[in-house]
Amino acid sequence: MNNLKRLTKTIFSCFTLSALLLLAGCETLPPMTDLSPITVTDARQATAWELQGKLAIKTPDDKLSANIYWRHSEDRDELTLTTMLGTTVLTLNSTPNSAHLHIDGKDFRDDNAQRLLERVSGWSIPLADLPLWITGQVGPNDQVIVRDSQGKPKQLTNTQTPPPWQVAFLSWQSQSGASVPHQLKLERSDLELKLQLNQWQALGKPAILVGEQP
């Protein structure tokens, strides 16, 4: 059984269990208690954010759909995939120097999140670049092919690691006061990812009131 089929089976098993018992499953992410919702005028102003949405992964052999929850800051990422009933089937927590993946009741560790996810799941997903694309930005290895009338990217190519990623910004929305993508499509060789952001919230350090102890 390939890795994607194993993960699909895991999600189906957790979905069945939650349907029968109405219990949330494998693992719950700890909250980022040091961050609070903020409003920004440009997504680049948000050094931290959280999103809720849907992720679809397709290969020639299989396909997978799941809810995605992602909390991102400059030094920490917490990514969770769940079934439609909310049962957690995969969590990936990482810092710049460490990564911990929990899937199918097993724990895996590495010092690189992208390498860890590829080793366990078989997906070569550009985790380092996704935070830029999710906020409508482009990186130094991105070549913008098409922009819309407002100058926002519609299509780009990422050539950091061949074969290149083709990224399409299918639609945009206003969230937390900023314009961010609503739907993204990533294609590379025989792997296709579709990401829909249903909610994107900019996060920041809470303000310290006068007279309040830091």
From Swiss-Prot:
Coiled coil: none annotated. It is found in: Cell outer membrane. The keyword Transport applies. The lineage of its organism: Bacteria, Pseudomonadati, Pseudomonadota, Gammaproteobacteria, Alteromonadales. Plays a critical role in the incorporation of lipoproteins in the outer membrane after they are released by the LolA protein. Gene3D superfamilies: Lipoprotein localisation LolA/LolB/LppX. GO terms for cellular component: cell outer membrane. Its main location: membrane. Residues 1-25 form the signal peptide. It comes from Shewanella baltica (strain OS195). This is Outer-membrane lipoprotein LolB.
